[in-house]
Amino acid sequence: MRLMWIMLFAALGLAAQTKMPNLALNCPAEASSVENQNLLPEFAVDGKTKTRWSSAHRDDPQWFKVDLGAVKTVGRVVILWENSAALDYKIQLSSDGENWIDAIHKNDGKGGEENLSFSPQPARFVRFTGQFRIQQ
């Protein structure tokens, strides 16, 4: 997966969405793999659109996880993709980093900017799990 960067937002009304803080900004991040040392997981949450995380070129699934540091209510995820993207992926939430629930399962990913809203839920950890890529 070539995730460019990811933003997580608290659940607020639509009018406030543009002013909502990015809950993932500079939070600790981990991933199943990295393509190289210039594409580390923390670059996906540094707020810079010129940096990104990219998984190693190997079999899927691949995952990327953010630790928000405390339980927060999450209701929206924005993903900005590089050239490659995931066709089939899940956004999963967890309060303990062990037990996950699916907030979204998308099987028609298109790349570009994907703005994903879902029923607001409490979570400390947010995980992207890419099942299949659009481009290899």
Q: Can you say where each PLM-predicted feature lies in the sequence?
A:
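Hydrophobic h-region of N-terminal signal peptides that target proteins for export
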Residues: 7-16
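Short beta-strand-plus-loop segments that form exposed binding edges in beta-rich domains
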Residues: 129-136
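Positively charged n-region of N-terminal signal peptides that target proteins for export
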Residues: 1-4
